[in-house]
């Protein structure tokens, strides 16, 4: 159901999302909202007892971050260097199944009567709990309470506590706890952002076993040659005799518990679930590892896992919580967004954060530049150890990036536009491989990480390789063009705005490449002086010559940086201003998003933007532009930006804040803050918009909080919205933890952890010391 009026869907509460009635019409959407994940395992909010509703009103998804199948990318008319192999994150076995039968009648929300229904996502304690009072078709009434946890502490573990109580009868009840490996990915959508390129079932069951209350299966992919084990164990908590039976299915296992239930007595089945994959562990040890995991969990007990979850989240919220007083909707929205970011992010250096997190298979589970530019800052300034893992992920892809550059005839490394673990998976090169700016985006994230943490060891041991290989690439990609005054030009590229493709001198790309080249030159020279042995080691490994480093500086110094004297703005690229200008107001509302209604040739023909391009550059390299320049470019590009990308509104909110367009700043912030929670685009059923969620944090901290990070300096120019009474957030920077609190009366900075530090409040320099409030 489209939420065209943008009305709130869930009651406003600080720490929970509450669903108060079950409806077929909203079920699909709610499966995304009530997803639980831990950066490794993701379980959509489907019901333990399964769902018998109509087709296309549910998708039962369980995902393991980075676990994928490969497939050939088929082109009717291919070409050299086209991406050949696709990767798709797989929907793996559903292990959360607990069916309930009462005297042979199946507990099913689409049968009988629902007398009471409530489902709660508790973001402080990290669980989903569902309470149902249900009357069977023959009049038996029972109360059911189901609590689910995907452990943030134990990445391979999930647990469910399923409690039932007969209200008006005594009779036979049966729990059926199962693993169902007969699964596939969504592939019936015409929206390229949603469907999968994998057709039908791709996982083959190669081993399975069930004994007593315990069972497991092992499944293997057909082409990527990965396997995984899923194991379950069950504990019945009841003062009652029970009988256990079980069965092996073609692609799964069932554990059946039968008992006599008395009226008014509660019976609980606790289920412990574990997944291990051959991507990370020896294939022959997967079952043993999964069984060991659930054995430990069973011995510790469900309550221990609950307690661990709350403690983990308590630590997270101490750093990451943003407090807003004066708008309960936004308070709930930003916490929901941050909670899902934490759930979605890989923390092992081998995985990243997919565009849809672990809530759905949209975009095939691929990682994009979103994680480097939009998502990285949230973790960098709240949980820097997670930011480090994201940068390490890029280092671990470096060999694949080198191979891609070589394939395309270039030196150095070219990172894939979309991938899971290395190869380019974007089949549409004009909005894929041509977005070379991803190289500089990754370096920008690396640079920010090093500046914010002082982790020079990471830079010298790992990051410098990324830096030098990407600089090599830029110097090789560009050329000195006589008719451009012998400036260094980068031609035939696509910038962040995907509604303009294959252009010369995209401003964002050129400025970011210049930054990349300059940083590489500076770090190479710094390493020569400060850590000569480490420099020699990396120079030898990369066969790096001094003349290359000089060439980087020359390219950076001579970089062509577009500017229009006539309009006094930065043109998006060499051709952009020579196209017909069309404003968003001129396009009928039913034509959005344009990519689903217009041929790309028609889109490329106009001055029309999917998302900020020049304006994103101005945000990322804010110190290079005056406020007047920012305003002129904002005024030019805003009317022609469709915001068809969920990445768009947050940047517009931040910049509008600085310019003084306070109403626009708030409007754009509202577009991003509850985009998924209120299902603004009628597509949250397909999964969250992870980068937009991170953009919410940026819109608060960089927008209303006015935080800018210049080289080794924290600046604040806060502006509390008139709708709010208070805004409070924390920032981790260079080993310090700083609290920023805005009220209508004043702004207060407090150093909570670390050594004294100087910050800037507008143009005023302030020395913060621990224990002092300024």
Swiss-Prot record:
Protein source organism: Thermoanaerobacter brockii (Thermoanaerobium brockii)
MF terms (GO), sorted A to Z: alpha,alpha-trehalose phosphorylase activity; carbohydrate binding; hydrolase activity, hydrolyzing O-glycosyl compounds
Xref: Pfam families: Glyco_hydro_65C, Glyco_hydro_65m, Glyco_hydro_65N
Reaction catalysed by this enzyme: alpha,alpha-trehalose + phosphate = beta-D-glucose 1-phosphate + D-glucose
Gene3D superfamilies: 1.50.10.10, Glycoside hydrolase, family 65, N-terminal domain, Maltose phosphorylase, domain 3
Annotated metabolic or biological route of this protein: Glycan degradation; trehalose degradation
Activation and inhibition: Inhibited by Cu(2+), Hg(2+), Mg(2+), Mn(2+), Pb(2+) and Zn(2+).
Enzyme Commission identifier(s): 2.4.1.64
InterPro entries for this protein: 6-hairpin_glycosidase_sf (IPR008928), 6hp_glycosidase-like_sf (IPR012341), Gal_mutarotase_sf_dom (IPR011013), Glyco_hydro_65_C (IPR005194), Glyco_hydro_65_M (IPR005195), Glyco_hydro_65_N (IPR005196), Glyco_hydro_65_N_sf (IPR037018), Malt_Pase/Glycosyl_Hdrlase (IPR017045)
Activity as a function of temperature: Optimum temperature is 70 degrees Celsius.
Top-level taxon of origin: Bacteria
Homology family: Belongs to the glycosyl hydrolase 65 family.
Main EC class the enzyme belongs to: transferase
Keywords on record: Glycosyltransferase, Transferase
Keyword Chaperone assigned: no
pH dependence: Optimum pH is 7.0-7.5 for phosphorolysis, and 6.0-7.0 for synthetic reaction.
Active-site residues per Swiss-Prot or TrEMBL entry: 498 (proton donor)
Keyword Glycosyltransferase: yes
Binding site for substrate: 369-370, 610-611
Membrane-spanning segments: none
Function: Catalyzes the reversible phosphorolytic cleavage of trehalose. Phosphorolysis is specific for trehalose, but D-xylose, D-galactose, L-arabinose, D-fucose, L-fucose, D-glucosamine and 2-deoxy D-glucose can act as substitutes for D-glucose in the synthetic reaction.
One GO BP: trehalose catabolic process
UniProt protein name: Alpha,alpha-trehalose phosphorylase
């Amino acid at each position: 159901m489209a939420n065209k009026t943008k009305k709130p869907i869930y009651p406003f509460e600080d720490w929970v999302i509450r669903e108060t009635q079950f409806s077929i019409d909203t079920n699909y959407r709610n499966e995304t909202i009530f997803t639980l994940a831990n950066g490794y395992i993701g379980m959509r909010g489907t019901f333990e007892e399964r769902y018998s509703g109509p087709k296309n009103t549910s998708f039962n998804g369980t995902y393991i971050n980075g676990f994928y199948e490969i497939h050939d990318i088929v082109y009717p008319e291919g070409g050299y260097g086209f991406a050949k192999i696709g990767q798709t994150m797989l929907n793996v076995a559903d292990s959360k199944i607990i069916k309930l039968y009462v005297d042979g009648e199946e507990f099913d929300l689409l049968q009988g009567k629902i007398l009471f229904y409530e489902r709660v996502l508790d973001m402080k304690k990290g669980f989903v709990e569902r309470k149902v009072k249900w009357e069977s078709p023959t009049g038996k009434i029972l109360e059911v309470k189901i609590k689910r946890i995907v452990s943030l502490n134990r990445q391979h573990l999930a647990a469910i506590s399923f409690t039932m109580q007969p209200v008006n009868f005594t009779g036979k009840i049966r729990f059926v706890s199962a693993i169902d490996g007969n699964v596939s990915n969504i592939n019936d959508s015409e929206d390229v952002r949603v469907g999968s390129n994998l057709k039908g079932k791709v996982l083959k069951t190669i081993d399975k076993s069930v004994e007593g209350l315990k069972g497991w299966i092992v499944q293997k992919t057909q082409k990527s040659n990965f396997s995984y084990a899923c194991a379950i164990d069950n504990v019945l908590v009841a003062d009652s005799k029970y009988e256990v039976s079980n069965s092996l299915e073609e692609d799964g296992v069932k554990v059946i518990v039968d008992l006599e239930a008395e009226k008014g007595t509660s019976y609980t089945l606790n289920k412990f679930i574990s997944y291990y994959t051959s991507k990370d562990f020896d294939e022959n040890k997967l079952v043993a590892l999964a069984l060991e995991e659930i054995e430990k969990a069973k011995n510790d007990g469900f309550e221990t896992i609950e307690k661990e979850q709350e403690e983990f989240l308590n630590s997270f919220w101490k750093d990451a919580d943003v407090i807003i007083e004066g708008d309960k909707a936004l308070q709930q929205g930003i916490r929901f967004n941050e909670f899902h970011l934490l759930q979605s992010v890989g923390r092992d250096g081998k995985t990243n954060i997919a565009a849809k997190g672990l809530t759905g298979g949209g975009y095939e589970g691929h990682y994009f530049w979103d994680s480097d530019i939009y998502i990285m800052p949230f973790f960098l300034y709240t949980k820097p150890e997670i930011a480090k893992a994201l940068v390490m992920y890029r280092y671990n892809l470096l060999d694949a990036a080198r191979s891609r550059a070589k394939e395309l005839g270039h030196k150095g490394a070219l990172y894939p536009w979309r991938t899971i673990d290395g190869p380019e998976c974007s089949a549409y090169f004009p909005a894929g491989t041509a977005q070379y700016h991803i190289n500089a985006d990754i370096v920008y994230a690396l640079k920010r990480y090093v500046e914010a943490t002082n982790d020079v060891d990471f830079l010298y041991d790992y990051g410098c390789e990324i830096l030098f290989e990407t600089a090599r690439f830029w110097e090789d990609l560009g050329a000195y063009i006589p008719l451009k005054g012998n400036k260094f030009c980068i031609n035939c590229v696509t910038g962040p705005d995907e509604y303009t493709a294959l252009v010369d001198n995209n401003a964002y790309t050129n400025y970011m490449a210049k930054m990349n080249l300059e940083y590489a030159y500076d770090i190479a020279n710094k390493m020569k002086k400060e850590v000569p042995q480490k420099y020699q080691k990396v120079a030898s490994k990369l066969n790096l010559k001094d003349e290359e480093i000089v060439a980087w500086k020359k390219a950076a110094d001579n970089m062509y940086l577009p500017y229009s004297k006539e309009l006094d703005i930065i043109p998006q690229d060499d051709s952009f201003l020579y196209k017909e200008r069309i404003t968003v107001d001129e396009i009928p509302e039913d034509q959005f998003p344009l990519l689903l209604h217009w041929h790309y040739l028609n889109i490329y023909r106009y001055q029309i933007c999917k998302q900020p391009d020049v304006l994103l550059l101005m945000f990322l390299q804010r110190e290079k532009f005056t406020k007047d320049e920012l305003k002129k470019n904002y005024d030019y590009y805003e009317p022609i930006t469709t915001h068809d990308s969920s990445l768009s509104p947050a940047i517009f909110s931040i910049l509008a804040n600085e310019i003084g367009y306070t109403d626009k700043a708030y409007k754009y912030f509202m577009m991003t803050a509850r985009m998924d929670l209120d299902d603004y685009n009628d597509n949250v059923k397909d999964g969250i918009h992870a980068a937009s969620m991170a953009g919410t944090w940026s819109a608060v901290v960089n927008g209303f909080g006015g935080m800018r990070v210049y080289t080794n300096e924290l600046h604040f120019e806060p502006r509390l919205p008139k709708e709010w009474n208070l805004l409070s957030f924390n920032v981790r920077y260079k080993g310090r933890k700083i609290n920023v609190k805005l009220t209508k009366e004043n702004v207060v900075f407090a150093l909570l952890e670390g050594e004294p530090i100087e910050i800037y409040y507008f143009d005023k320099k302030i020395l913060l010391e621990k224990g002092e409030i300024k």
